[in-house]
């Protein structure tokens, strides 16, 4: 039985993506939970690339996974590749054969499908019938000659498999209701189920957190570990993400790749803060660092219900990150835009409260540097032209706006919103934004129509 999770300096967790595609928000949830558990316990976090599929695994995807993790600040203590460990998987397979827990089977997919349909028609669970165990040596040789190598299945003990899950609580699965899992394909490819078992036990992994779609996998893997004379780690299974209305998220995951969110302007801490709390009893709050996130992280706050995810919830958090960012943290970016050093701090104070994404910093500097395209309603055109004719030449300071609007008010009789809004829109090309006194003192060109 798997023990419940507890904090310990010997905690070892892992995130084990397959380099067959880009990471998406569903992957991130698993990665983040395992990272935070290790971080909080002062333990070890392993990035393990499950690259046993040579046809689909690529170095480009492996690199992309690491780039996404680095962008988010989810640093790993060591990296492992399953493609470097085939000798260990072969040794484990040999050990299972020696213990009569591994057997070869030759059914075709069509034959297996027919068996499943017959079982369902008879109201029986669609479980592999272990027909291969009844084959004689001569029959095996004949099948091998006809069909080549078969698949290798692990022979489950037909008893209940029980463990205390870190999120779902006490679980019990009847092994008789589960098919003996295929661990090695006919082409020799080692599958996830055994590779993960060997890696987790060899690497001393103490805590495994993954999606609830792995619960049956966990049951079979516990038996495989026991057959190999190993102890099972603590398991926890988090709920799966759905769309905002509870719809399946799987079809949308391609548009929720981490690299796409990064390119769209998402701030890492906004994404991490959201993903660390949704689906829990704790409110989503913007954290200042991964250390702060780890300190407040506890699997006991999570439940089994599907977790709704809406990417739109991330943008207010991203804006909050930027609003709270100190000048020192963006000084290099601002200097690269060409903002003069003497006004750079003042520019950031004005810009940061009025941006939702980092890319918008450049938009504000373009406005101050080059001027805006005026936004003028037809009924205000004559008024704005008169006001602009009264605008003094550069340089401007914090009194320019009040002095100018006072003069315009006296000359035109306009006041309040009818005075200020048309001038704001004409100077900035926007209906909303910073205090106009701050805008004017940062202008590098005289506004014109």
Curated annotation (Swiss-Prot):
One of its GO terms (molecular function) is tRNA binding. Its EC number is 6.1.1.17. A motif ('HIGH' region) lies at residues 17-27. Gene3D superfamilies: 1.10.10.350, HUPs. It is found in: Cytoplasm. ATP binds at residue 251. One of its GO terms (biological process) is glutamyl-tRNA aminoacylation. Pfam families: Anticodon_2 (PF19269), tRNA-synt_1c (PF00749). It is an enzyme of class 6 (ligase). Keywords: Aminoacyl-tRNA synthetase, ATP-binding, Cytoplasm, Ligase, Nucleotide-binding, Protein biosynthesis. A motif ('KMSKS' region) lies at residues 248-252. Its main location: cytoplasm. It catalyses: tRNA(Glu) + L-glutamate + ATP = L-glutamyl-tRNA(Glu) + AMP + diphosphate. Signal peptide: none annotated. PROSITE patterns: AA_TRNA_LIGASE_I. GO terms for cellular component: cytoplasm. Catalyzes the attachment of glutamate to tRNA(Glu) in a two-step reaction: glutamate is first activated by ATP to form Glu-AMP and then transferred to the acceptor end of tRNA(Glu). Monomer. Belongs to the class-I aminoacyl-tRNA synthetase family. Glutamate--tRNA ligase type 1 subfamily. This is Glutamate--tRNA ligase 2. It comes from Jannaschia sp. (strain CCS1).
